[in-house]
From Swiss-Prot:
Region of interest (Beta-amylase), residue spans: 36-454
Cofactor binding remark: Binds 1 Ca(2+) ion per subunit.
Cofactor(s) the record lists: Ca(2+)
Name used for this protein in its record: Beta/alpha-amylase
Sequence repeat extents: 455-558, 565-668
Molecular function per GO: alpha-amylase activity; beta-amylase activity; metal ion binding; starch binding
Keywords: Carbohydrate metabolism, Disulfide bond, Glycosidase, Hydrolase, Metal-binding, Multifunctional enzyme, Polysaccharide degradation, Repeat, Secreted, Signal
């Protein structure tokens, strides 16, 4: 394991990551979570390219879009229009007229700041050049592109011109100034990154002689571009001699460095695959990356404070010539796309959403087109998912039914956040009538959109529906407008039980006309008439026995209309319960009061608290008072409380005194009483007895009495029974969490690096002065225990039965986010939370039958000496440490075990285990930690650096399952440590998995590796993994498919299939399920993204489901049944449960006939648990065919 000192790397172990509230429940292999769009998905339509001349027709088109569920109109805002008169002479009048028309229709408006030319490209129906005055700002050589044949292109400014950023900054600033008043209708802004509004080079331009499916041409032949390439190479290598050494050339001058002189020959002669070729392609893309950073920074500078919306940019779907063997990916590379991983990372770094196109297209990868658009969409979308980059989609060409189905497949498979259809005239005729294409768009795309209940700009109608139908639908139209398609829109559950709710933007209409049904053609009766709802909030109650229902003004009693997630100011109040069922009576400062007693507050996610969120519009404070709903009020000296926007916690005062308000949510420090019994009223102690959880109350074990005080004051506890009460009241015990007594050989572990997993409590991000900085991979990022708690369902639904989290001890460095540089053993690091929050995590994991393993470091502390002293007491004594200097490469290479155990690992202070005081304190500490937390197992870091004698003592003191990290490839060396600990991470198997599955080597290596199991005490408890936080991700290191080395998922799936079905405890590192592909530390420690619809998440969930339902696959015996270079099979058995696993490691389909199975007779039918095919044993054997890289798991 590697560590860093100062700015060095430190290995931190974690593997896990979970969730965002995933709703999938895994009940059977075919019942994993279905694919879905993102929670905020919306469907938009692209407006015309040219100016609108007939506003009446355009407004009819907009109204039809609105009536059919379209969210927004996306519009090119042409630089050539708005600044044509001269530098900084802007005219925005046309686009203000445009925005007003959109606003009138009740739609949103998504502007594209189009800094490119319109005209000359496929689909262009206008001619809008760049502002003519631009040519005076620089030379043509600087500002234009030039291709291989010498054609000069001025579709967009060259990113290499130094003035490009300044011009865009001025344009963005003027837009922000002029459209600040339209912020309510602008949910997003797009940036043009180059030709056709895409971040690319103008490599395929018909006016330059290109026609489909031509490769296109490189655009790096101006002197400016050539000099930029030369400078970049000199900067990279440092001298011409080193360039020659790298490229195998004999250049005598930097001026001899040029882009490829023959673009076609660059491919046919193999130049693209040479060191020179790779350097050129990498530099060529880097120009686009830098340009994206420049325009992204300018946009955030000018737009964030004004609009506060997401900003996006687009890359082109260059899908042809992808698999042409003569020039693989030539079209993409001419456009500037050499490494999608790196390019999409730039979107992440620039905090920009990514729009991708050609979602409607299918692959046809044969000559002459070699077109693979569907594969390309999958590749780009997968990388974006893995990196947490938000995706939006477009079609490339007009589309129909099958195209819409293809779009639906992609947006749901990869959790897209939006889709924009090109263009409006394909959906709506000039008279406002729909075309045939609109129905397909509505069926497959608009139907996926989430209700926009709060963001509209017109009049709004909010309806609470008292449930007659359990799942009511509302079929409606703005009065005089168009109806929704029957049965209409499904209403969502309201914040008050027994009601559904919807808010509809009706544009300029004054009423909403509606009817209700159950979605199955059963309609609410109103004597065949529709109901009419006025603007504002109304409550509808169905009539009895088929009679018409009634409409009353306002929300139902107890509702909180302001809790709907509006776009205005919000106040969230946590109320520490004095009243068991508190009400809040409130008004936005200066506004109107709720009707007394106000709104009943709901139980918060933190025990002992109630909570409410109120939308206060443009007000800056919420004025409030609390009561119990029965006219008993909290006292604040007759004054009301004032809460500012954001989150606050209110604690009632003692003895009638005023309560206190502090900023932020409560810490969650809650004492859980396992079985606590108390009287609810001291005056009625013979009355009902309740058993509940008590919050923040200290009770002695024996006889105690708990009583809520009156008037909302804090609770009290006394150490005797109340007069006349039962003297044998059972208070249970105030205990810490307890272990699940886990059989670890049955578990499947998800490894979590806590700081990089999920930020559930931003209030602790800057703990101890070591601030969170997401832009620096070596510093804290904000993940914490609350984040893991929030994502437990994400982990559970993936089928994992255990989590392993990185160390929890307090650190004292801005670089110690990983937890391996302990300062205080007896304190939890505040970045992660508190001891109470850690206990809560353990309890809630145990509630879901998830065991918890914690990483611990007993070899060393952080690097606190010399100069800064030692770790915190009692680890603050010089003789508790070795002072033998750093372990060197020579020590490792010569296997100097004495130095390996007694030297400093990367400068970290090595503990002296031979000192009894040190050894005893470490054993005391681990007993304390286990007792406090109730964790179920330990992962020990840097075990090969710890004396084996101490390990044995430590293992006995812990008296729990221990798994050691012995970073070494020799199974005899690693296996010896299982004589002192319960288990070891199987690094020898890791190296074999990497070779066999990641680099297509012989499956016989698996057989050879299993022959080394004799070195382990019990190989069934070896931790088996494909990668972790100390090594490159599997997808980074894997070789990929020959001829298409970007295609690595099949290799990963084969490795996962092996890992989750073979002997040992499988351990999957967080992010694997999202297709993460980071390289060496810290690139392999990415922040998590939680897409439960990701193909890899679903695949892992299916494998875990099979494993969890078959004891044989957990810790059953394992016997090899077949091995050759490309195929492997084994059988696992336990107590009558039999499973046979087949793995094809080839890139071709493979068929084998395999026999000699145990405990299975002729005629036995076996079913593949990963799909639906089955086989039957005949003559003692099975014949199976597996697709390339496929894994099959057959059971009875």
């Amino acid at each position: 394991m590697t560590l860093y000192r100062s700015l060095w790397k430190k290995g931190c172990m974690l593997l896990l990551s979970l969730v965002l509230s995933l709703t999938a429940f895994i009940g059977s292999p075919s019942n994993t979570a279905s694919a879905a769009v993102a929670d905020d998905f919306q469907a938009s339509v692209m407006g015309p390219l040219a100016k609108i001349n007939d506003w009446g027709s355009f407004k009819k088109q907009l109204q039809t879009l609105k009536n059919n569920g379209v969210y927004a109109i996306t519009t090119d805002v042409w630089w050539g229009y708005v600044e044509s008169a001269g530098d900084n002479q802007f005219d925005w009048s046309y686009y203000k007229t445009y925005a007003n028309a959109v606003k009138e229709a009740g739609l949103k408006w998504v502007p594209i700041i189009s800094t490119h030319k319109c005209g000359g490209n496929v689909g262009d129906d206008c001619n809008i050049p760049l502002p003519s005055w631009l040519s005076s700002k620089g030379s043509a050589d600087e500002m234009q592109f030039k291709d291989e044949s010498g054609y000069a292109n001025s579709e967009a400014l060259s990113p290499l011109w130094s003035g490009t950023g300044k011009q865009y900054d001025e344009l963005y600033a003027s837009f922000a100034e002029n459209f600040a008043g339209y912020k309510s209708i602008i949910p997003k802004i797009y940036l043009s990154g180059g030709p056709s509004g895409e971040l690319r080079y103008p490599s395929y331009y018909p006016a330059a002689g290109w026609s489909y499916p031509g490769r296109g041409k490189f655009q790096a032949y101006t002197e400016t571009a050539k000099n930029a390439f030369r400078t970049a190479m000199n900067d990279k290598y440092g001298s011409l001699d080193k360039i020659n050494a790298a490229w195998g050339t004999k250049l005598t001058s930097l001026s001899q460095i040029n882009p490829p002189t023959d673009g076609d020959g660059f491919y046919t002669n193999g130049g693209y695959n040479s060191a020179y070729g790779k350097d050129f392609l990498s530099w060529y893309q880097s120009v686009l990356e830098k340009h994206l950073g420049v325009i992204g920074a300018a946009a955030h500078k000018n737009f964030d404070s004004v609009f506060g919306v997401r900003i996006g940019a687009k890359i082109s779907g260059l899908h042809w010539q992808m698999n042409n063997p003569a020039m693989p990916h030539g079209t993409e590379q001419a456009g500037g796309y050499y490494d999608y991983n790196r390019l999409i990372q730039k979107f992440k770094d620039a905090d920009l959403d990514l729009t991708f196109t050609c979602l409607e297209m299918s692959d046809s990868g044969t000559a002459p087109n070699y077109s693979l658009p569907s594969t390309l969409v999958d590749t780009v979308s997968s990388i974006a998912n893995a990196k947490g980059v938000r995706l939006n989609g477009e079609n490339a060409l007009p589309t129909g039914g099958s195209g819409f189905q293809k779009i639906e497949e992609k947006i749901t498979k990869f959790g897209y956040h939006g889709f924009t259809l090109l263009r409006i005239n394909n959906l709506v005729n000039n008279d406002g009538s729909p075309t045939g294409e609109l129905s397909g768009f509505k069926q497959y795309i608009i139907s996926k959109a989430k209700p926009d209940n709060n963001g509209g700009t017109g009049n709004k109608v909010t309806i609470y529906y008292k449930k007659g139908f359990n799942s009511p639908y509302i079929h409606y139209r703005p009065a005089g407008g168009s109806w929704t398609a029957a049965p209409g829109v499904k209403m969502q559950d309201a914040e008050i039980s027994g009601y559904a709710k919807i808010t509809v933007d009706i544009g300029s209409a004054s009423q909403l006309e509606a009817a209700f049904n159950d979605g199955n053609n059963n309609w609410d009766s109103n004597n065949t008439k529709n109901y009419s709802f006025s603007t504002g909030t109304s409550t509808y109650t169905p009539g009895n026995s088929g009679n018409a229902g009634t409409i009353t003004s306002g929300a139902p009693a107890g509702a909180n209309p302001g809790d709907g997630g509006g776009t205005t100011n919000k106040v969230t109040v946590y109320y520490k319960k004095g009243f068991n069922s508190p009400y809040i009576h409130y008004r936005p400062a200066g506004g109107s009061w709720t009707a007394a007693p106000g709104v009943k507050m709901q139980d918060a996610e933190i025990s002992g608290y109630a909570k409410i969120t109120v939308d206060i519009g443009s007000a800056s404070q919420l004025e409030a008072a609390f009561n119990d709903g029965n006219n008993n009020w909290d006292s604040n000296n007759t004054k009301n409380y004032l809460f500012s926007t954001g989150t606050s916690t209110y604690t009632p005062g003692s003895n009638g005194a005023a309560g206190t308000i502090r900023t932020g949510a409560p810490s969650g420090s809650v004492l859980s009483v396992v079985t606590s019994t108390y009287a609810t009223d001291l005056n009625e102690v013979t009355g009902p007895i309740q058993t509940e959880k008590l919050s923040g109350v200290s009770l002695n074990v024996s006889t105690s009495t708990y009583a809520p005080n009156s008037n909302g004051v804090e609770v009290t506890a006394q150490t005797e029974a109340p007069s006349g009460a039962f003297t044998s009241m059972d208070l249970g015990t105030l205990s810490n969490p307890t272990s699940l007594n886990t059989d670890w050989s049955k578990q499947s572990i998800y490894f979590i690096m806590t700081d990089r997993f999920s930020n559930g409590d931003p209030s602790n991000d800057n703990y101890g002065g070591f601030n969170s900085n997401n832009s620096d991979q070596r510093k804290w990022h904000g993940g914490d225990f609350q984040g893991i708690i929030n994502k437990l369902d994400y982990i559970k639904n993936m089928g994992f039965t255990a989590i392993w989290i990185t160390p929890v001890t307090m650190q004292k460095s801005e670089y110690a986010y990983h937890g391996y540089h302990t300062y205080d053993f007896y304190a939890v690091d505040g970045h992660l939370g508190t001891m109470d929050k850690l206990q809560e995590l353990v309890r809630k994991a145990h509630d879901k039958n998830i065991a918890v393993m914690v990483d611990v470091v007993v070899n060393h502390t952080g690097d606190f000496q010399p100069g800064n002293g030692f770790a915190k007491a009692p680890f603050d004594k010089a003789d508790w440490y070795h002072h033998n200097g750093d372990i060197t490469d020579g020590d490792y290479n010569s296997n100097n075990q004495w130095k390996i155990e007694n030297g400093d690992v990367a400068g970290l202070d090595d503990l002296n285990h031979e000192n009894p005081a040190t050894a005893n304190e470490l054993k005391n500490w681990i007993k304390w930690l286990l007792n406090e937390t109730g964790i179920d197992g330990l992962r020990l870091d840097t075990v090969k650096h710890v004396p084996k004698g101490f390990l044995k003592d430590f293992d006995q003191a812990a008296n729990t399952f221990t798994m050691g990290e012995i970073f070494h490839g020799d199974p005899a060396y690693v296996g010896d440590y299982t004589r002192y600990l319960d288990a070891a991470l199987d690094f020898p198997m890791y190296y074999t998995i990497k070779d066999v599955f990641g680099h297509d080597q012989s499956m016989r290596k698996i057989k050879d590796r299993y022959s080394d199991d004799r070195y382990y005490r019990d190989a069934q408890t070896n931790g088996v993994f494909i990668d972790n936080h100390d090594v490159k991700r599997f997808l980074n290191d894997a070789s990929g498919k020959p001829g298409a080395n970007y295609d690595k998922w099949p290799q990963l799936k084969a490795a996962l299939g092996f890992t989750l079905t073979s002997r040992g405890i499988p351990i999957i590192y967080q992010g694997t399920e999202q297709g993460y592909s980071g390289g060496d530390d810290p690139a392999n420690r990415e922040n998590m993204n939680f897409n439960a619809n990701h193909d890899l998440y679903q695949y892992i969930a299916k494998l875990n489901y099979v494993r969890n339902n078959h004891p044989a696959l957990q810790n059953g015996s394992q016997r090899e049944k077949w091995v050759d270079d490309s195929f492997y099979s084994f059988q696992r058995s336990k107590n009558g449960d039999e499973a046979i696993v087949f793995i094809n490691n080839s890139w071709n389909s493979q068929t084998r006939t395999i026999g000699n199975f145990d405990n299975l007779s002729n005629g036995t039918r076996l079913t593949n648990q990963l799909s639906n095919d089955s086989v039957q044993i005949n003559n003692g054997s099975i014949t199976v065919t597996l697709a390339p890289k496929e894994v099959k798991v057959f059971t009875k």
